[in-house]
C-alpha cells in the first residue's frame, strides 16, 4: 500500500475523523511522519538500484596501517560514494550488495591467536560498547544487551563461546539489542577459515531486523566478515567487510554512515580505542 502525503494530510485535518481512518493508513502515516523527523527519507531504495552493476570486484585489500595510525575506513554505495576500486567480496556468501563497508587496521594486543579468537566468542562484552553517532554528533552506547544463546529461537542466556567452540566450525548464535531498538535480535557466528597465523569469522542476521513493523534488513541480508592475521609479536592485522544486500528503509547515505560507525565501533572494542570518525563523512 502506497500512502500519499495528501492522504495523510486529509486524515490529520481537524474536520477529519482520524480514529475512523483504516488502521493501516494510520500506521503508514505515522511511519511517514517519524521517518521525516529522523531524516531517513524515502521508505525504500530506488528501483533503479536493481539495474546498477554489483559492488563486488577483484581489487586486492590495502596494506595494514601501522598500529599507531588510524584505521583505513572505506565504503561503497551502489548508487553513491565509492572509496576506490570495487573490493573482493570473497569473505561474504553473496555478491549482490547495495552497500559495503571495509575497515583495515592493525593493533597491539597480548596473547596468541586463540586469545584473539576468543574475543569474538565473548559476545557479552558487546554490552555497553559505544560508537560515534553521526546524527547525534556524540558518542552513545551502541549495545544495551548482548549474550550468547544455544539456538536463535531462544532468549535464554548461556556462557560466552570459547575459542574451542568456535574452532568446531559449528554455527553459533547470540542476541543483542541496540540503542535504536529494544528488541533482542539473533545473529549467527561461525569460524569460516583458520590457519596457524590467521582466522576469519562470518556474522549474519538470522531473522528480519524491523522498525515500526517495517523491514530494515531481511534475514541473512547483513553479512559481516572479519579476518585477523598475526603480523608479529603482539601485533595483529584486522580486516572487516560488512555487506548489506538491500537497503529497505531510508536514504542510502544514512545507511552508509550508520553502518560505517558501527563497523568502526566493533574494531574499537577489540583494539581498545575510540576512533574519531567524523572526518569519514
What kind of feature is each model-predicted range?
Residues 275-281:
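Short, highly charged C-terminal tails/helix-capping segments
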Residues 218-231, 236-245:
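Compact beta-sheet-dominated globular domain cores
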Residues 186-193, 223-229:
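Hydrophobic/aromatic beta-strand elements that line small-molecule binding cavities or substrate pockets
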Residues 166-175, 196-201, 211-212:
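Short, hydrophobic/aromatic-rich segments at coil-to-beta transitions
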Residues 212-217, 242-263:
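A short acidic/glycine-rich loop-to-helix N-cap element
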Residues 202-209, 241-243:
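Generic short beta-strand segments
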Residues 1-45:
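N-terminal secretory signal peptides
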Residues 53-181:
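Hydrophobic ligand-binding cavity/cleft-lining segments
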Amino acid at each position: 500500500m502506497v500512502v500519499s502525503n495528501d492522504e495523510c494530510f486529509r486524515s490529520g485535518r481537524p474536520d477529519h475523523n482520524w480514529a475512523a481512518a483504516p488502521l493501516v493508513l494510520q500506521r503508514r502515516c505515522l511511519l511517514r511522519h517519524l521517518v521525516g523527523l529522523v531524516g531517513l527519507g524515502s521508505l525504500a531504495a530506488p528501483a533503479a538500484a536493481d539495474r546498477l552493476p554489483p559492488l563486488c570486484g577483484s581489487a586486492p585489500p590495502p596494506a595494514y596501517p601501522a598500529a599507531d595510525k588510524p584505521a583505513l575506513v572505506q565504503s561503497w554505495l551502489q548508487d553513491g560514494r565509492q572509496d576506490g576500486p570495487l573490493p573482493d567480496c570473497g569473505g561474504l556468501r553473496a555478491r549482490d550488495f547495495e552497500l559495503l563497508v571495509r575497515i583495515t587496521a592493525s593493533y597491539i594486543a597480548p596473547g596468541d591467536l586463540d586469545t584473539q579468537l576468543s574475543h569474538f566468542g565473548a559476545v557479552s562484552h558487546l554490552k555497553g560498547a559505544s560508537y560515534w553517532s553521526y546524527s547525534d554528533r556524540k558518542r552513545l552506547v551502541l549495545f544495551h544487551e548482548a549474550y550468547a544463546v544455544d539456538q536463535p529461537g531462544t532468549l535464554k542466556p548461556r556462557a560466552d563461546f570459547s575459542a574451542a567452540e568456535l574452532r568446531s566450525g559449528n554455527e553459533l548464535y547470540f542476541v543483542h539489542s541496540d540503542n535504536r531498538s529494544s528488541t533482542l535480535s539473533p545473529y549467527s557466528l561461525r569460524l569460516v577459515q583458520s590457519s596457524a597465523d590467521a582466522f576469519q569469522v562470518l556474522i549474519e542476521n538470522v531473522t528480519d531486523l524491523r522498525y515500526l513493523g517495517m523491514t530494515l534488513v531481511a534475514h541473512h541480508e547483513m553479512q559481516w566478515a572479519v579476518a585477523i592475521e598475526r603480523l608479529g609479536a603482539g601485533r595483529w592485522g584486522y580486516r572487516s567487510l560488512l555487506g548489506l544486500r538491500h537497503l529497505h528503509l531510508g536514504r542510502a547515505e544514512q545507511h552508509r554512515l550508520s553502518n560505517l560507525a558501527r563497523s568502526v565501533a566493533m574494531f574499537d572494542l577489540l583494539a581498545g580505542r575510540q576512533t574519531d570518525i567524523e572526518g569519514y563523512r
